[in-house]
Each structure stands twice: as structure tokens, then as C-alpha cells.
Regions:
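Periplasmic-binding protein-like
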Residues: 93-108, 126-130, 178-183, 209, ...
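Venus flytrap/periplasmic-binding-protein-like
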Residues: 79, 127-129, 134-138, 215, ...
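Extracellular/periplasmic periplasmic-binding protein-like sensory domains
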Residues: 250-330, 410-413, 424, 436-438
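Bacterial N-terminal signal peptides that target proteins for export
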Residues: 2-12
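Segments of small-molecule ligand-sensing domains
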Residues: 310-323, 334-408, 412
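Beta-alpha junction/loop-to-helix N-cap segments that form part of ligand/metal-binding clefts
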Residues: 30-32, 45-55, 59, 64-140, ...
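Extracellular/periplasmic Venus flytrap/periplasmic-binding protein
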Residues: 85, 135-136, 144-254, 291-299
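Bacterial N-terminal signal peptides
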Residues: 11-20
């Protein structure tokens, strides 16, 4: 009996060891993406759409063999777009999952990005703030681990002002015009106030800044002020529920929707559909179009959505602005990982190694064509000095049913913005005791 028990114990131990080795081997060939997501609260539409697209793209990559055989894994932690919860989620997820190392963090929140910036830098984990974030983090010599991919906030408002200039008949026609900016009362909303004042001074237009307290349900006083001011244009820097409320409020005071330009977080179907007829004619910027007429979207539909694995609770949101932004974000994260593997090996990588991949992203038309994303993602080229890589937008207009593109690419005035960015980054470096990298020595 004792002999039998010993054999059973030995067999059990061997089974446990084998299981552990199998699990370890599996985790050893997985790359982890920690997701500080938000699917409840006033900004749930943005969070659920974005993270739905991001996750579906990761599933699509796995369905096609992963990244050079390395499978992608992820887990979510609900932040409700609350900074404190975002920090808690960061700390909970940063260490990886079952042995799979974390590649990058993508919180889709300016507040959470600001709160975790120093932590992610210390932990050597890339912080991705696509189309938002801290503008001076564009300067990678000071912010090596932060990437405001495609479009930083300064580029956003600069491109909008350039477009207004085009609509008025030339940049010189901006002089004497009245432009009101209705902005979300958060770090995100306030990020561009200073540079807008600089742009107003340079171009000679009259600027009025109007704050809307979070979350944006009440805007009556701001729109009564706009009715009194009679601005030529209104720039809407909203988020979540603030956007449809703004469009309805504009209609009530008689301000035309076709002279309101929404920023990058005021450009989705979820921003206009709740406003009904008040949204018809509304213009917004975009770094990517909505729609499903892209091979990568069709691939996701075939291998993920039609297979019953799609992440969206409402399949009708497939191909919408927020969803497609999540897909774009997935493409950029995976391409950074793929590029880093070329340097460090086809295996799971550390955040420090993945950072190199982000900093060397170079997506030209040929690569975008190969990814099935030409026309969905703008060409990007990053470097040590430039963690944005794009800086261009297109303008779209809501016809009551869908978004229609109404412009070619409009570039921000990057030559004007660069000294402002560098001065701000230098100030941060001095305050934090950081020695900027010599980008000429980076490879």
C-alpha cells in the first residue's frame, strides 16, 4: 500500500511538473497587452468601440499565426476613465500575464497617461497615446517611452486653423475672424489652450475659450455666450456626452452646424446620432475614415466577427470611427512588435525592446498596402526626435446618415509647433533632472 501511494505521488508530481512546463512553454511564446479599458460611464462609447477594435485586430493576428509565431494575449481592467482607477490598473497589469511580458500600455485617456507617464518610463514600458496625450512627448529625446502616435493635440488644432483658413480663402483671411473654442474641462480639453492663443496671435484672429465642465451635460450658458459673440467658427473639443449636447445646444441658439468643427474626439457616429437633425452638416477632423471597405477590416470580419468572436456588444458598430481607430492602434502596436522582433529575435520581447520598434516605425504606402490598411492608416515615420510621425488630418461632414470626406490631407504647421514642443520638453527635462538623449547617436 505504501509503495502504491509513493508511485501515485510520484506520478502526480510528474504530471504537475509537466503541466507547469507546458504552461511555461506556452507563456514563453506569448506577448501580453495590458488593457486599461473603459466600457461603463459617460465615455463608454469611445472606450468600448476603441478597445473592441483593438482586441479584434489582436484576434485577427492570432488567427493568422501571431507575430512570427508569437501569439498575442491580453486582459482588461476597467478604469471608467477615472485617473485613480487607471493607475491601479496600470500597477496591476504591468508585470505581464502568466509569464508573457507586457509590450505596451494604451490607456486612451489623457489623465491616465499623465498619471502613469513617469511610472511607465521607470518600468521601461511604452505608453501609447494615439491622437492624444501630452504634446511635448513628441520629443522622444526627453520622453523615450511615450508615443503620441499620428496626431498630437497641437497638430490637431493647428490643422483645424489651417482648414478654416482654406475655407475663408487663404491664411491671410483669418485676420479679424472670430473663433470660439468649446473645450472639455479636463487635462485633455485644456491641453491646447496655450497653443491656440499663439496661433491666434500669429494669424490675427479673435479667440474665445469656453470651458464645459465634465462630463458636459450642461452647456446652456456657453451657447448663450456664443450667440452673443457671433463667432465665424466654433471648434468643438469635446468628449463623450458633451458632443451631442453641444450640437443640440447650437441648434437651440441658432448656430449653424456646418460652422462647427469637431476635433479628434468629436468625430464619431456616437457623437452625432444622438443629436439627430441637429448634427446634419457638422464637420469634424479624422485621421482615419469609417467604413469596412479595407482588406484588413474584411479579414477581421471573416476570421473574427463572422466566427462569433467579435468583441463588440453591438455588431452594427463594426467599421465605425471608434472601432476603426482601435484597429489602427492595433496595427501600430503589432507593427512595432514585428519590427522589434527583426532586431531582437522572433520571441516575446520586453517593453524596452518593443520601444525600439515604435521609435523606428516606418509605414509607407507599400507596407500599408501589404497590411490591407492603405487609406485607413496615414503613412507614418517615427524617430528619436519625432514620436508623432504624422500630423495630418482630413475633414469629414455628417449628412444625417454617414460621414463623408470633404478634404484632402491637411497638414499641421509643424515648423511653427516644433520650437514650442522642444521648449516645453526642455522645461520638463530641467524640472525632472533628465538628460535628453542625443538623437544623432540613436540607431
Amino acid at each position: 500500500m505504501t509503495h502504491r501511494l509513493s508511485l501515485r505521488r510520484l506520478a502526480l508530481c510528474l504530471a504537475l511538473i509537466t503541466a507547469g512546463l507546458t504552461a511555461g512553454a506556452q507563456a514563453a511564446n506569448e506577448q501580453y497587452f495590458p488593457l486599461q479599458s473603459y466600457r461603463v460611464g459617460p465615455y463608454a462609447a469611445g472606450g468600448s468601440g476603441f478597445f473592441g477594435g483593438f482586441i479584434d485586430y489582436l484576434q485577427y493576428i492570432n488567427a493568422n499565426g501571431g507575430v512570427n509565431g508569437v501569439k498575442l494575449t491580453w486582459s482588461e481592467c476597467e478604469t471608467e476613465y477615472v485617473v485613480e482607477k487607471g493607475v491601479e490598473c496600470y500597477e496591476r497589469l504591468k508585470g505581464g500575464l502568466n509569464g508573457a511580458p507586457a509590450a505596451a500600455t494604451n490607456p486612451l485617456s489623457v489623465g491616465i497617461a499623465y498619471a502613469t507617464l513617469e511610472r511607465s518610463t521607470a518600468d521601461k514600458l511604452p505608453l501609447i497615446t494615439i491622437n492624444h496625450g501630452r504634446t511635448d512627448s513628441t520629443d522622444g529625446s526627453v520622453f523615450p517611452y511615450v508615443f503620441p502616435l499620428q496626431l498630437n493635440p497641437y497638430s490637431e488644432v493647428s490643422a483645424i486653423i489651417n482648414y478654416i483658413g482654406q475655407r475663408e480663402g487663404g491664411a491671410d483671411k483669418l485676420k479679424g475672424k472670430k473663433i470660439a473654442v468649446l473645450y472639455h474641462g479636463s487635462p485633455y480639453g485644456k491641453e491646447t489652450n496655450g497653443v491656440l492663443q499663439t496661433l491666434a496671435k500669429n494669424a490675427g484672429f479673435e479667440l474665445t475659450l469656453l470651458e464645459v465642465p465634465h462630463p458636459g451635460n450642461e452647456q446652456q450658458s456657453q451657447w448663450l455666450n456664443i450667440r452673443r459673440l457671433k463667432p465665424d467658427w466654433v471648434i468643438l473639443r469635446g468628449w463623450g456626452v458633451m458632443n451631442p449636447v453641444a450640437l443640440k445646444s447650437a441648434q437651440k441658439v441658432g448656430y449653424p452646424a456646418d460652422h462647427i468643427i469637431g476635433n479628434i474626439w468629436s468625430n464619431s457616429e456616437e457623437d452625432v446620432v444622438p443629436a439627430g437633425a441637429a448634427a446634419k452638416g457638422f464637420i469634424s477632423i479624422t485621421t482615419h475614415p469609417s467604413g469596412t471597405d479595407f482588406p484588413v477590416l474584411q479579414g477581421i470580419a471573416q476570421s473574427v466577427v463572422n466566427a462569433g468572436k467579435g468583441n463588440l456588444a453591438d455588431p452594427k458598430r463594426f467599421g465605425t470611427v471608434y472601432y476603426n481607430l482601435g484597429v489602427v492602434n492595433g496595427i501600430l502596436n503589432v507593427e512595432a512588435l514585428r519590427l522589434a522582433q527583426e532586431k531582437y529575435g522572433q520571441k516575446p520581447l520586453t517593453g524596452e525592446q518593443v520601444r525600439w520598434g515604435f521609435e523606428h516605425l516606418n509605414l509607407d504606402d507599400a507596407r500599408l498596402q501589404a497590411l490591407g490598411a492603405k487609406g485607413l492608416v496615414q503613412p507614418l515615420k517615427l524617430s528619436c526626435a519625432d514620436h508623432e510621425g504624422g500630423g495630418a488630418v482630413r475633414f469629414q461632414q455628417w449628412d444625417g446618415q454617414r460621414w463623408n470626406l470633404i478634404s484632402d490631407w491637411v497638414q499641421a504647421d509643424r515648423a511653427l509647433l516644433r520650437p514650442i514642443i522642444e521648449a516645453s520638453a526642455a522645461g520638463y527635462a530641467k524640472e525632472k533632472g533628465i538628460t535628453p538623449r542625443d538623437c544623432s547617436q540613436e540607431q
